[in-house]
A protein has these predicted regions:
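Short C-terminal tail/terminal secondary-structure segment
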Residues: 220, 231-247
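A conserved structural motif in NAD(P)-dependent oxidoreductases
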Residues: 204-215, 226
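Active-site loop-to-helix junction immediately N-terminal to the catalytic Tyr of the SDR YXXXK motif
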Residues: 99, 143-151, 163, 246
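Alpha-helical segment proximal to the catalytic Tyr-Lys
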Residues: 124, 166-170, 228
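Substrate-binding pocket helix/loop in short-chain dehydrogenase/reductase
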Residues: 95-96, 100-108, 188, 200
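Active-site helix of classical SDR
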Residues: 119, 153, 161
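Conserved glycine-rich cofactor-binding loop
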Residues: 7, 14-16
């Protein structure tokens, strides 16, 4: 797919799925902005990608003033945005009995408020016919123990994306959702013990974890003209996790 000259904004683009997607868009010719909370991680990402078409923005999109920093960086470039990939996210897994207000607020601020207001602030900067893609998760549908807050954030994102697809349709802006299953990323490593990875792999029909590059390819497809009649849809990229029945 060719994205030469297209302008792409990716939140949470310094590691994992965001980084893999930034690489894919750069390789397809796009100009890419990535955000992250850590300047160090953004520097590492920039060195790894090593392209003049990449710009990094230190911004925690859970904070509205920092969304304004991203908006300013985009507007100063003088170009409208063709693709907005709302990907930043965090997770902690605890039973409802043990969850804290801090757990709740952190995940909803990053996973829901951040996406909502980043979209809101960047809508005026989207070209007509742009593509907006949300990173959700199979947990929005699944009912795994210990995931109540994280799952709730992803369920909320799905509804926001579906309504946005209707609200922005008059400008031919398509809004879609990519919902990964268990994917090998630094984020996954940070929230589950090593022995749990084998369990997650066994819970998929393909009997393995996904790769961030596989999610990136789906994002590029949804952002491309090949998906021009896809709007308000959720794409499960989960190796059969949701529908797999263990034998």
């Amino acid at each position: 797919m060719n994205f030469t000259g297209k302008n792409v904004v990716i939140t949470g683009g310094s590691t994992g799925i965001g980084l893999a997607t930034a690489k894919a868009f750069i390789n397809a010719g796009a100009n890419v902005w990535i955000t992250g909370r850590s300047a160090g991680n953004l520097e590492k990402a920039a060195a790894e990608i090593n392209s003049p078409n990449l710009q990094t923005v230190v911004a925690d999109t859970a904070q509205l003033p920092e969304i304004a920093v991203l908006e300013k960086a985009v507007t100063q470039a003088g170009n409208k945005v063709d693709v907005l990939f709302l990907n930043a996210g965090i997770a902690t897994f605890t039973p409802i009995e043990q969850a804290t207000e801090a757990d709740f607020d952190a995940q909803f601020n990053t996973n829901v408020k951040g996406h909502y207001f980043t979209l809101q602030k960047l809508i005026p900067h989207l070209v007509n016919g742009a593509s907006v893609i949300f990173t959700s998760s199979t947990v929005a549908t699944a009912t795994n123990v210990g995931t109540s807050i994280y799952s709730a954030t992803k369920g909320a994102l799905n509804k926001i994306a579906q309504i946005a697809a209707n609200e922005l349709a008059d400008r031919k802006i398509r809004v879609n959702i990519v919902s990964p299953g268990p994917v090998q990323t630094p984020g996954l490593e940070s929230v589950i013990p090593p022995e749990a990875k084998a369990y997650l792999a066994a819970a998929t029909a393909l009997q393995r974890l996904g790769d961030a590059d596989e999610i990136a390819k789906t994002v590029l497809f949804l952002a491309s003209d090949d998906a021009s009649f896809i709007n308000g849809a959720e794409f499960l990229v989960d190796g059969g996790y949701i529908n797999y029945a263990t034998k």
